[in-house]
């Protein structure tokens, strides 16, 4: 009773307070209930998501079976993944909450990434689905604020898709209201300034130390499969791991990589692909995603080293393993080596960038976060497993904020890991050495050659030549160098390969030969009983002793009986087919006419092409294949001389009309290369063009002449028969309009007094009327064959019997010869090439 009376007195005295507290508790409970998750609704949504993912997996598995069949060359597919109806069904069920990973880039579905398909069981254990959420598909561009930043307005005016514009606008609005980035970030390193650990090469190695295992990530693109094979051959060891990411746009390379690496269980190809661009934020995303994969796939590697196909080792694997074993708790990154403020400005770290539509858009300036030190240098690194695990699985504030900050950063991979390590508890693991040498020639490598894909001027390293090998001598421990392109210079790669692992035996074939895939096309032609092309399979560039010698063309051919002109050779009476390779070589095009002239004494080579590499000083479209809409460059190589002089070149079109002229000076007191862009109005007239060389407008004396051919265009946007081809293949009609720079050509034409070829004009007008069919193809063949010749052919087979078995009896002739087998033909890409062949693992764990 006393307790009851006491409680009553308490309530009378504090009644108002009790009511107030009770009211507050009720309000809190109400809002808690309103904001708490609806468990039944969440369960319902979870089940819907599971059903949706299951449907995706079923469709992806169906697609996988079809892709497997394509990869292995099966004719009878369970389901054809190239069928637009099937792919439409697959992507129809896509939800933008599920980011399906990309496959072989078949089709033009750009709303989301597509599913990755596993060609064999050794490569992928499952079809992976990304966990990150992709942005909603924007139907209409709607900025959320009035954008006033000049750079952002410029980016919006140049972006083409609504989705990209929306990304730019969203970032710009957050920039303007100051919410895009945190003003400061936490620093947990106990050192006030940047810390660097010195890791010299030990004079001796402890044999009792457990050797490290390395996980190599190879980021590859293009078509140089042989160079990639050669790199794998020299860095391979059964104790290491290899994870290969093939660029989303390199379908040919992906197929070849999958085929070449099947026999090695410690090599995996990424089941996802990204289309990375120079300087793009996607480069860092690719690295982090790969690190996440290899952490999950392999549990016992110690170091992560990223390479490209343009890298090559300069020390043996054993020495690298010994060095890293000594410093297994360190991280190797190259710092910029200049003042921080200067590096930040040159790197664009004080600017905001957004990547979309395969472009890095500059949106404006930003302040660097307070509290941390921003560091950077090279994006080629060697990271220990502890840092890798922290970078992808950590969740502290510094890491989370840095990842967000670098989403809007140019060249993020060149700075992210440096900044993360220098400001975290791992700062004492930083070694200012990325264990490689890069061949920089900034006078040639910093030409703003990436302005078409990034709103910034950047630099790119140069290829190594034998004369650059002296740069490999450094005071710091280095184990790799870059860049090497065998299509530019193979001798330097041979030198390093032979130095590390010894010369190949005398008589080894193809040591100084190179083949590189250039093209895959389809072609069909009618024929009688002669052997006829059924389908062209691929074209490979061929170099020998550092010189381009031609193209190797692989094609299916068949014997076709007498049929109508429009019949398909593939439907011959007996279906007999063989596979052949043909060697096509360009005809000599440079003629020296006055060998006594100074020009003739110095001019070594001259050629015309369309893909001029300002950094390496070469034309990359080997053979000078020019079309009506090509940008044409004249490139000449000159020997050394004490005297220089002015060269005049005059360009004459197929109608014998002067179309352009240029004056330039030869290199002074040195050998060198000159490049002259020709100002020719498009479309160019198809046929034979002529370039004449004079010494400083001495037009009475032609020193040299160079031919090049403009080939008629057969397709427009991949479609045959477009009526616009008539105008394209006719070329510029008015002689007064043939020069794109509107130069006054009257005096040159008057001086040379060339007779216009009116018959050629009549023939050109007649030929250009054909926009499809046999007559257009014959015209193309005629122009191409004027500058190219088929030198030889060989049989793609194990035995000559293949030819005799395939040849119909009605086409057999006594004493008829059989083509040589390609494997016995030195120009063939199927002939032995031991320096790039991947073989079985040897007892020492290597394949070289």
UniProtKB/Swiss-Prot annotation:
One of its GO terms (biological process) is heparan sulfate proteoglycan biosynthetic process. One of its GO terms (molecular function) is metal ion binding. It holds the Pfam family Xylo_C. Disulfide bonds join 145-173, 189-427, 446-459, 448-457, 529-811, 794-822. The keyword Ligase does not apply. UDP-alpha-D-xylose binds at residues 219, 247, 276-278, 379-380, 460, 482-483. This is Xylosyltransferase. The lineage of its organism: Eukaryota, Metazoa, Chordata, Tunicata, Ascidiacea.
């Amino acid at each position: 009773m006393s307790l009851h009376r006491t409680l009553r007195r308490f309530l009378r005295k504090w009644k108002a307070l009790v009511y107030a507290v009770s009211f507050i508790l009720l309000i809190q409970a109400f809002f808690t209930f309103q904001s708490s998750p609806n468990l039944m609704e969440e369960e319902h949504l979870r089940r819907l998501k599971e059903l949706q993912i299951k449907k995706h997996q079923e469709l992806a598995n169906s697609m996988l079976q079809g892709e497997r069949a394509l990869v292995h060359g099966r004719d009878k597919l369970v389901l054809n993944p190239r069928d637009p109806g099937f792919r439409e069904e697959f992507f129809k069920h896509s939800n933008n909450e599920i980011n399906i990973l990309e496959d072989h880039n078949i089709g033009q579905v750009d709303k989301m990434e597509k599913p990755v398909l596993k060609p064999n069981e050794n490569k992928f254990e499952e079809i992976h689905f990304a966990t990150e959420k992709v942005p909603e598909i924007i139907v209409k561009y709607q900025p959320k604020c009035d954008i006033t930043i000049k750079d952002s307005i410029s980016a919006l005016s140049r972006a083409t898709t609504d989705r990209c514009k929306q990304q730019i606008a969203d970032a710009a609005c957050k920039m303007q209201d100051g919410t895009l980035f945190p003003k400061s970030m936490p620093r947990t390193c106990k050192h006030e300034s940047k810390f660097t650990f010195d890791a010299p090469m030990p004079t001796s190695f402890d044999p009792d130390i457990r050797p490290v295992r390395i996980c190599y990530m190879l980021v590859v693109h293009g078509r140089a499969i042989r160079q990639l094979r050669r790199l794998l051959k020299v860095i391979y060891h059964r104790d290491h791991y290899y994870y290969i990411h093939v660029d989303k746009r390199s379908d040919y390379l992906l197929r070849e990589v999958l085929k070449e690496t099947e026999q090695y269980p410690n090599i995996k190809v990424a089941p996802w692909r990204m289309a990375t661009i120079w300087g793009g934020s996607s480069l860092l995303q690719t690295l982090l995603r790969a690190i996440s994969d290899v952490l999950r796939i392999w549990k016992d590697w110690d170091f992560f080293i990223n390479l490209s196909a343009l890298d090559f080792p300069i020390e043996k694997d054993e020495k690298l393993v010994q060095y890293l074993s000594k410093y297994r708790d360190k991280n190797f990154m190259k710092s910029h080596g200049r003042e921080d403020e200067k590096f930040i400005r040159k790197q664009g770290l004080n600017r905001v960038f957004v990547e979309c539509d395969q472009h890095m858009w500059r949106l404006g300036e930003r302040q660097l976060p307070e509290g941390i030190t921003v560091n950077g240098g090279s994006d080629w690194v060697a990271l220990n497993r502890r840092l890798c695990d922290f970078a992808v699985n950590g969740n502290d504030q510094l890491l989370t904020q840095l990842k967000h900050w670098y989403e809007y950063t140019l060249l993020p991979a060149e700075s992210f890991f440096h900044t993360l390590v220098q400001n975290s508890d791992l700062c004492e693991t930083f070694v200012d050495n990325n264990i490689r040498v890069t061949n920089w020639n900034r006078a040639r490598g910093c030409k703003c050659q990436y302005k078409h894909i990034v709103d910034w001027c950047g630099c790119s390293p140069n290829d190594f030549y034998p004369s650059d090998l002296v740069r490999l001598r450094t005071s710091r421990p280095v184990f790799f160098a870059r860049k090497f392109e065998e299509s530019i210079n193979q001798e330097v790669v041979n030198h390093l390969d032979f130095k590390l692992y010894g010369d190949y035996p005398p008589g080894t074939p193809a040591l100084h030969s190179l083949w590189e895939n250039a093209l895959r096309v389809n072609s069909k032609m009618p024929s009688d009983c002669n052997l006829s092309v059924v389908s062209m399979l691929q074209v490979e560039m061929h170099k020998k002793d550092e010189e381009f010698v031609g193209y190797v063309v692989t094609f299916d051919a068949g014997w076709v009986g007498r049929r109508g002109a429009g019949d398909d050779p593939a439907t011959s009476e007996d279906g007999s087919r063989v596979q052949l390779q043909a060697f096509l070589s360009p005809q000599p095009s440079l003629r020296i006419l006055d060998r006594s002239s100074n020009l003739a004494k110095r001019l070594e080579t001259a050629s015309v092409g369309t893909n001029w590499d300002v950094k390496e000083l070469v034309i990359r479209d080997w053979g000078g294949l020019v079309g009506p809409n090509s940008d044409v460059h004249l490139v000449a190589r000159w020997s050394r001389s004490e005297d220089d002089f002015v060269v005049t070149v005059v360009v004459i079109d197929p109608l014998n009309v002067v179309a352009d002229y240029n004056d330039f000076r030869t290199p002074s007191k040195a050998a060198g290369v000159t490049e002259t862009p020709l100002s020719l109005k498009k479309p160019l007239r198809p046929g034979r063009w002529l370039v004449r060389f004079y010494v400083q407008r001495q037009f009475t004396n032609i020193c040299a002449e160079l031919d090049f051919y403009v080939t008629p265009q057969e397709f427009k946007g991949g479609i045959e028969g477009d009526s616009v081809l008539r105008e394209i293949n006719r070329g510029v009609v008015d002689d007064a309009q043939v020069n794109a720079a509107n130069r006054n050509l009257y005096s040159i034409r008057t001086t040379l007094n060339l007779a216009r070829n009116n018959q050629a004009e009549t023939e050109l007008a007649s030929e250009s009327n054909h926009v499809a069919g046999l007559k257009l193809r014959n015209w193309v063949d005629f122009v191409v064959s004027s500058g190219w010749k088929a030198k030889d052919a060989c049989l793609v087979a194990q035995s000559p019997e293949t030819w005799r078995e395939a040849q119909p009896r009605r086409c057999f002739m006594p004493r008829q010869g059989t083509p040589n087998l390609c494997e016995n033909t030195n120009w063939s890409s199927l002939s032995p090439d031991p320096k790039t062949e991947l073989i079985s693992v040897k007892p020492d764990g290597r394949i070289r």
